[in-house]
Regions:
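Membrane-embedded transmembrane helical bundles of large multi-pass transporters/channels
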Residues: 1-48, 56-63, 236-242, 246-508, ...
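Solvent-exposed, non-transmembrane loop/terminal regulatory segments of multi-pass membrane proteins
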Residues: 37-81, 88, 203-219, 471-480, ...
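Extracytoplasmic
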Residues: 164-310, 613-758
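Glycine-centered tight turns that cap/initiate beta-strands
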Residues: 102-103, 555-558
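Short, low-order "capping/linker" segments at domain edges
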Residues: 118-134, 467, 570-586, 746-756
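Charged, amphipathic alpha-helical linkers/stalks
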Residues: 573-639
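Membrane-proximal extracytoplasmic
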Residues: 2-294
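Short proline/glycine- and acidic-rich turn/helix-capping motifs at secondary-structure junctions
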Residues: 110-118, 563-575, 738-744
Length: 900
């Protein structure tokens, strides 16, 4: 029997007569779209670019950047127990990076400035300088001997002599002070020996030994020396997916090269800063989305193979879907022209959303085949009887997305345009390309063998066989089902009131990222805080006044401004340091020699160990407090000697050489540097280097104040308190914390607004489409039940909303309604009972739609990026909740209203 294609009218008539033309046109347009996207699409990686431009906080931010320049530096954190070692690493890295001005626009390394090396001690509090003086004077007897002959023999012999003099006359004048000095040096030496035992390298660190207060804690200067900061301003490749990639790659390459050098053993280095955080976020999310997209397609194919029971229909549906996605990319490029961290996931969205329209068409066609329809008639029925339902369903989803455009947040608005356009394209492809493919994939191209067995595999009987017991519960007791659903919905109100919003952007990053680890480390560092608010002052006097007010606030730790580089109490500090220099005038460093004098060492060690034991016994007899640290040192010393004895015939000489070299090789140079810093001159504002002036004084002559928080401010409550305090001094305060706080607030409000707009639009669509208040209300049942159950599931699993996963709320709203529309339309138009509707091809289609959406978004759970991962989790929970609403609650409601 031959088919008469001329009998088909309307859209399907056009498709059935020109399937090859439609497919060819679609493929050509898809290719053009892909090429156009490849050549033209750009990426916004900065969150600043996603924010509204007309707000006061954004105006303040732009004014600061315009006056003081780009300060989004790559931050290199260099750590070492020895300040000089960290400094040398930084200087070498600075020199290498300075050779690449086409990649690194500007470098800043405070340790490399002679200003700080010469005047660093003047920035210490007077109390810390007094502790430094006391410590140096306690160590002076040993330092004097070590400076003249830096060796293990000198160190141990000098300490032995000091202990013997004390033991000879413990009650003599000055003996108490000698004991304090001995205890101090033994404790310091013990620290070096333990470090050697742990890492195989010892270092007689002046910072470790001398820069400690009377409470034993390190001074701020010592802590800052152990963690040094180099900043690099990258040359950005605008429009690139990762604009600072070249600079970050260069810096990491140079760091890896330097760390391989033996002289930099013990140095650890990490990168952070806004460019690095954005680079790693975009790179991670890009990899994750690509992986998730591929996995989503695979899972969708598997689901379709199970549902369609044949390759031809699956191939037709997937080809149509891929064409729709390609065309959607072209639409996104043409209308918006760029992607951002939010809109980058729209391809995954379209896989789940776009395939549902094709599922309805194919399953209805199979159902018609099962009833004995001609294959072309079956395809026509699958298309024509779903047109209105698909249009309504797509309208609800598109409306949910279009409400994004009513918000002030550019990133959200752009996603709304792209996704709504993508939904419209998916519908257009479903109505044209998909039926064309179904026609072309028929045996004989639809011209021969019109029987059902030769084309699609038909669905026999009811599309979904429901077990009798389950069917009796679902459809035999609708009131019980509805009562149970109401109870669960009421119970879900408690989780709804408890679900939180996580404002911490670092929690969106992949776990274990170096940039995140170092961002937290800098936040906890009082000396090197890399996360601060910015206040601008009109003059130096205004800056000083604002700094005093800011530092009096409970949430502010300290303020750094140009005035901070002129030390306070200079006459007092200079007098103290000059006096100390005179006291140490007989400490004259001589060059280091590696001569171990092996023949003398056993006797020197034995005498030293015996004297320490005698001192411990004497202190125990006198019940002196110093007995405890001396006893701890004796244990450390015995462990060290035991290691030497163990390696006596293999590597004892190497161990001793390493120990002496690590402990004393750099001591002469360090002593010279220390002596130089003990002779500072008065510092005035005119002495501050231009590198610092440039960073803290703008083009307009205004002064910059960096306001460091007292506590971590990555979470909303401490951040809000900090900004409230800072803004009490200057309402126009800006900086990264302000931008994060305001952008997260705007994003949260934008999604809330979009949700309400979408709800209003969907109610309007339901009223217009159904022309019935009753069925419009019924259409809202899956939405309300699904949302409440989803939030309850999030609460049970400890999942909070965040700036990434909140994107799914309007989406769940649209999907919850559109699937209900299919069921209600069939129920009303074909007069079938609720149980038949749910188990028909339409019901199977809704079930399969939900599974494919769950699969496409669930694929995001393979992501390392926690924001992308959370989108997958929340959307999957939403689809499970909606599935319960479709399969259980909605049929019960329809059953209850039957005949009314």
């Amino acid at each position: 029997m031959h088919n008469d294609n001329s009998r088909y009218r309307g859209l399907f008539g056009f498709v059935v007569r020109r399937p090859r033309l439609i497919l060819a046109a679609a493929l050509i347009l898809s290719l053009i779209s892909v090429l156009y996207t490849w050549k033209t699409m750009t990426f916004l990686t900065s969150r600043v670019d996603l924010m509204p431009k007309n707000t006061q906080f954004h105006t303040d931010y732009r004014a600061w950047r315009q006056d003081f320049g780009d300060m989004e530096d790559i931050v290199v954190v260099i750590e070492a127990e020895d300040q000089e070692l960290a400094g040398r690493f930084g200087l070498e890295l600075h020199a290498r990076l300075a050779l690449k001005p086409e990649i690194i626009r500007e470098l800043f390394f405070p340790f490399g400035l002679d200003f700080f090396r010469r005047n660093g001690l003047l920035f210490m509090p007077v109390a810390d300088l007094q502790s430094l003086r006391d410590n140096l004077l306690l160590a002076k007897p040993v330092l004097r001997e070590l400076a003249a002959a830096p060796s293990v023999q000198t160190l141990f012999s000098t300490l032995t002599g000091q202990m013997e003099r004390y033991l000879a006359a413990p009650s003599a004048a000055g003996a108490e002070r000698d004991l304090v000095g001995i205890s101090f040096m033994l404790t310091s030496l013990g620290s070096g020996i333990r470090q050697f035992g742990e890492s195989g390298a010892a270092s007689f660190s002046l910072q470790e030994v001398f820069f400690r207060g009377k409470d034993g804690k390190e001074s701020a200067l010592a802590r800052a020396g152990k963690m040094q900061i180099l900043t690099a301003l990258p040359v950005r490749s605008e429009g690139s997916f990762v604009p600072a990639e070249l600079a970050i790659s260069l810096i990491r390459t140079e760091i890896d090269s330097l760390k391989k050098r033996p002289e930099f053993k013990g140095v650890t280095v990490g990168l952070t800063g806004v460019p690095v955080l954005e680079h790693e976020e975009m790179a991670t999310s890009d990899r994750d989305v690509k992986t998730a997209t591929a996995l989503s397609l695979v899972l969708t194919v598997i689901l379709l193979l199970v549902a369609f029971r044949g390759l031809r229909n699956v191939a037709a549906a997937m080809i149509a879907l891929v064409i729709a996605i390609c065309l959607s990319f072209g639409f996104a490029t043409l209308t918006v022209g760029r992607l951002n961290i939010l809109s980058a996931v729209f391809a995954v969205m379209l896989i789940g959303i776009g395939i549902e329209y094709g599922i309805q068409v194919v399953l209805r066609s199979q159902e018609e085949l099962a009833r004995g329809a001609d294959p072309l008639d079956a395809i026509a029925a699958g298309l024509n009887r779903n047109i209105w339902g698909i249009v309504m369903a797509a309208a609800t989803v598109a409306a949910a997305f279009l409400t994004f455009t009513l918000t002030d947040f550019k990133g959200v608005s752009e996603l709304g345009i792209i996704a709504a356009g993508g939904v419209a394209i998916c519908v257009l492809v479903t109505f044209t390309v998909l039926p064309a493919l179904l026609v072309l994939f028929m045996p004989g191209n639809g011209a021969q063998e019109a029987g059902a067995g030769k084309g699609m595999k038909p669905l026999s009987g009811s599309a979904l066989q429901c077990p009798a017991v389950l069917g009796q519960f679902l459809f035999g007791h609708p009131k019980r089902v509805i009562a149970l659903a109401i109870i669960l919905c009421i119970a879900s109100l408690f989780p709804l009131s408890r679900i939180g919003f996580d404002y911490n952007l670092l929690n969106l990053q992949a776990k274990g990222l170096e940039s995140v680890t170092y961002a937290y480390k800098l936040m906890k560092s009082k000396e090197n805080s890399g996360y601060f608010a910015v206040v601008v002052a009109d003059s130096a006097a205004d800056a000083e006044a604002k700094a005093r007010r800011l530092e009096s606030l409970p949430t502010v730790d300290h303020v750094v401004s140009l005035n901070s580089f002129v030390p306070d109490r200079q006459p007092e500090k200079i007098a103290l340091l000059h006096s100390l220099r005179r006291d140490l005038s007989d400490v004259q460093p001589k060059p280091y020699s590696e001569d171990l004098q092996l023949m003398e060492l056993p006797e020197v060690f034995e005498r030293f160990r015996t004297t320490v034991a005698r001192l411990k016994a004497e202190l125990d007899r006198g019940k002196r407090n110093e007995a405890v640290p001396v006893g701890e040192f004796l244990k450390t010393l015995d462990a060290f000697f035991a290691r030497l004895e163990k390696n006596r015939n293999s590597n004892a000489l190497g161990m001793l050489r390493d120990f002496q070299g690590g402990m004393l090789a750099e001591l002469p140079e360090k002593l010279k540097l220390l002596m130089a810093t003990l002779e500072p001159s008065p510092v005035s504002s005119a002495d501050v280097p231009q590198e610092l002036v440039k960073r803290f004084k703008g083009k307009s002559g205004k002064y910059l104040l960096q306001v460091a928080p007292r506590n971590e401010i990555f979470d909303r409550e401490p951040l809000e308190a900090f900004l409230r305090d800072v803004r009490s001094v200057d309402p126009h305060a800006t900086g990264e914390p302000v931008m994060v706080y305001e952008s997260m607030t705007i994003m949260r409000d934008a999604y809330r607004g979009a949700f309400l707009y979408a709800l209003a639009a969907i109610v309007a669509i339901l009223l217009v489409a159904f022309r019935s208040v009753k069925f419009a209300v019924i259409g809202l049942v899956p939405l309300l039940v699904g949302l409440l159950f989803m939030v309850a599931g999030m609460w049970v699993f400890g999942i909070s909303f965040n700036p990434a996963n909140i994107i799914v709320m309007p989406l769940v709203l649209g999907i919850a309604v559109d699937s209900g529309i299919y069921l209600i339309n069939r129920y009303r138009n074909e007069g079938e009972p609720a149980e038949v509707v749910v188990t028909s091809s339409t019901g199977v289609g809704v079930f399969l739609n939900t599974l494919t959406i769950m699969a496409s978004f669930g694929a995001l759970m393979v992501a390392h990026h926690q924001g992308v991962f959370s989108i997958g989790v929340v959307m999957s929970l939403g689809m499970v909740a909606c599935q319960v609403a479709f399969v259980v609650v909605l049929p019960a409601v329809l059953k209850l209203v039957e005949g009314r």
